Design a protein with these regions (language model features):
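N-terminal active-site segment of His-dependent metallophosphoesterases
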Residues: 26-104
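Hydrophobic core
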Residues: 9, 13-20
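Beta-strand-turn-beta hairpins that frame and shape the catalytic cleft
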Residues: 26-34, 43-47, 164-179, 210, ...
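Non-catalytic terminal accessory segments
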Residues: 27, 317-568
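His/acidic metal-ligating clusters that form di-metal
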Residues: 81-89, 119, 176-178, 188-279, ...
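Divalent metal-coordination and catalytic microenvironments
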Residues: 38, 90, 95, 110, ...
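Active-site environment of divalent metal-dependent phosphoester hydrolases
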Residues: 42-45, 98-101, 129-138, 185-188, ...
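Extended active-site neighborhood of metal-dependent phosphoesterases/phosphodiesterases
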Residues: 105-200, 206, 274-277, 290, ...
Length: 568
């Protein structure tokens, strides 16, 4: 009996020891890190200046970036990373500063913050340049950038591509970073992807595999769509031939891609015809609402991520540096910097959109047949956005004349709801869907605009303009399906409604753009150790057919809902 107890006790001790060992191994096997982007550091002004007509946020700029507060926001972000004992390193996917091409001192200031962080914590920072960081014939060229940020990836690099900011570095024993400079230094915002850069990524992905490492890619420009109408409204913010590029990256074994540039918090997923899955995590600007970054915990089996925010700064240091902040500003910041940043964003976005509502800004040239129609619509849009939504003489009353019901809400005017929707996109994990009250109000405002302003225009002019718009937006392939579905729901479609459908056809498709089952801010995806490649020809064919069929059915289903809300 004693012998049996002894054996049992030994077994318990052995199993317990193994369990402890496996637990310790699991903890050691985790890789924890933070990802931020678009810091857009500005040297703070000596004194604030009134830039817009807003009661509180009168110093907001057209980009809605908290420029004077930016340095302190970066400080607090680094403080949070330092305080997190599990955080092993920090990735920053470009636009470290705002005016880096012409004001080199901004880079020096940011590098000093990074050096202090690394010296105090021992945690490395890895950077990649963005379109604001360097240029040709500028105060900062790529050699200057690499020299200033030598300690933040380049000195530890396994490979460096001369004349660019691209490099590779091992993050730990299992993972290798491929830091790709996606910029064209001769351009303002568009990408500089080339066959040579793609081939370099291919070589580095193969080398990582040969060395027993999983490749993680970081670049500034988006790999996948993150914004409704991105190919139209933000065509310079995503790499060219993005699906082809995503297919190559996925089939080369890259699963995680970190990008910035678009200033939105969004996660997008794509599956190549071979069945390989790739995720593009676009991280919003750290110094704009919602002052957000992501935190990742990576194991072979699973990649967990969560959004974290900066909700306070040293306001004493702020007022000591820049004069002009009122006590109301400081009180609102101290009550919650995130709420303050949202108000700042809405004020800045309204100012920017008010300046940008021009046909040329929308990519519609003056010689286009539908230019006049669009110009009429845009002119009416500004009026509808500015007028009160409710009350005597308000938009709700005007809409009723066209049998359009504007639901009651707390919004004051059209600008209020439009900027709210924009803020949701910046924050990610958008809380709206096509059934929501807020989307209904927005769509019916657009419907009212077109019905009120275009009702007197001849049908043949509207029909021709509609067909050319379908072609301009690249949605002409679904004209017949859209028209058939609209007729089945609404009956015969008028020329005004047909033009309206053409104008918003990209928006229709955009409502399914984020319907991919991947949460933007908080979630989990399969790790690098999971197998998803399906290389058999039959599987490849099935993947293509299933994907195409799913997209088509999703568009048509949601279009039906959209029409009921939009047309009224």
């Amino acid at each position: 009996m004693k012998k049996a107890l002894s054996v049992l006790l030994s077994a318990v001790i052995l199993v317990t020891s193994l369990a402890i060992g496996f637990t310790a191994f699991a903890a050691e096997d985790e890789m924890n890190f933070a990802v931020a982007s678009d810091l857009h550091y500005n040297i703070p002004r000596e004194e604030l200046e009134r830039d817009i007509d807003d009661e509180i946020y009168w110093y907001a700029n057209r980009r809605a970036a908290m420029e004077d507060e930016s340095g302190l926001i970066i400080d607090e972000f680094l403080n949070q990373c330092a305080a997190d004992e599990k955080c092993e390193f920090v990735l920053i996917s470009g636009d470290l500063v705002d005016n880096g091409k012409m004001i080199h001192q901004e880079h020096i200031d940011v590098a000093a913050k990074f050096s202090k962080f690394e010296a105090e914590t021992g945690k490395p920072i890895y950077v990649i340049p963005g379109n604001h960081d360097y240029g040709v014939d500028c105060e900062t060229n790529i050699d200057d950038f690499v020299r200033v940020y030598a300690d933040f990836g380049y000195n530890e690099a396994l490979t460096v591509v001369e004349g660019t900011g691209s490099y590779t570095a091992d993050l730990n024993e299992k993972y290798r970073l491929i830091a790709l400079d996606s910029n064209d230094p001769t351009k303002s915002t568009e990408d500089g992807m080339s066959a040579e850069k793609l081939e370099w990524v291919h070589e580095q992905a193969n080398q990582a595999k040969a060395d027993g490492k999983y490749p993680i890619l970081m670049m500034h420009h988006n790999l996948l769509d993150h914004l409704p109408l991105q190919r139209i409204l933000s065509r310079n913010f995503i790499v060219r031939f993005h699906y082809t590029t995503a297919t190559l990256f996925a089939d080369w074994g890259i699963k995680l891609v970190f990008t910035g540039h678009e200033h939105c918090s969004d996660a997008a997923v794509y599956t190549s015809p071979m069945g390989n899955v790739i995720y593009d995590f676009a991280t919003t600007s750290l110094t704009m609402y919602p002052l957000q970054y992501r935190y990742f915990t990576v194991t072979d089996d699973e990649i967990k991520y969560e959004a974290k925010t900066v909700d306070s700064i040293d306001t004493d240091a702020l007022t000591a540096t820049t004069a002009g902040f009122t006590q109301e500003h400081i009180d609102l910041m101290n009550a919650g910097l995130n709420d303050y940043a949202k108000g700042f964003l809405k004020a800045g976005v309204q100012y920017r959109l008010g300046k940008c509502f021009r046909m040329e800004e929308m990519g519609i040239e003056e010689d286009a047949f539908y230019y006049g129609l669009g110009e009429t619509a845009v002119g009416g849009l500004v009026k509808i956005l500015e007028d009160p939504l409710y009350g005597e003489g308000g938009i709700q009353e005007l809409a009723a004349e066209y049998n359009l019901e504007i639901p009651d809400s707390e919004y004051k005017n059209g600008w209020d709801i439009v900027t709210e929707l924009v803020s949701w996109h910046y924050a990610g994990s958008e809380p709206y869907d096509i059934y929501s009250r807020d989307i209904t109000i927005f769509l019916r405002l657009v419907s009212l605009l077109l019905k009120d302003d275009l009702s007197a225009i001849a049908d043949n002019v509207l029909l021709k303009g509609a067909n050319e718009l379908f072609s301009h937006f690249g949605t002409d392939s679904i004209i017949a399906d859209i028209t058939k579905l609209a007729t089945s729901i609404l009956g015969p479609v008028s020329a005004v409604e047909y033009f309206l459908l053409a104008l918003v056809s990209p928006l229709i498709c955009a409502f399914i753009a984020d319907d991919d089952g991947v949460d933007d801010n908080n979630g989990a995806i399969p790790g690098y150790g999971t197998v998803n490649a399906q290389s058999r020809i039959s599987n490849v064919f099935n993947n293509v057919v299933t994907t195409a069929k799913g997209i088509y059915e999703s568009v048509m289903t949601k279009l039906g809902i959209f029409l009921k809300i939009f047309i009224g």
